[in-house]
Amino acid sequence: MDKCNAKCKMPNAKSLMKIRFLKIKGTWREVADAARTTIRRDEGEGEPSTKWKKRILLAEHSPIRKLCFNWKWEDLPYWVSVHFVRHKYGIEHFVSTQRSDRTGEDRTAKTQDAPVVHECFANAQAVMFISRRRLCSQASPETRAAWKAVVEAIAEKEPEVAACCVPECVYRGFCPEFKSCGFVDTPAFKEAVAKYRTV
């Protein structure tokens, strides 16, 4: 188990959410070899370059799904957990039960912000896709804070993946939301887009 723990005080939350980054499954060599298979080449050797990693992540070719991440939120407000379980492609969720017959506590007495343990296992493409929704300023501040903690943990192990975790506007180059937060009209937006696209 990788030791990569972080605590985060969530906006308007009663408890201190904690994240544990458990492990990475798959290697960049495996990603590269899968890519080589698609062009009828034998397996290669060594670690792919940072530039190659960024390029295949931006292209979102299928081999990147061989790289997977496992993490766990602790004391995550239940309603924030519900936001995350809406994501279903390339990710699995394991959420602690609130059933009365399992916990010995009255489920009907629990509030929406009751803390839960929420573990996830997701591939690189799913992590990038979820980032587009959950790093957006239209996402709730609490959900955004929880997802930022995931991206920051990934950045310590796989910085190229974290560099491709951006909000929808940076990914598309414009804001598709009905009500924009205004970020697209700032110099910081142009800088973020340029940084995202740089290989």
Report each predicted region and the residues it spans.
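Family-specific signature for flavin-dependent thymidylate synthase
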Residues: 1-199
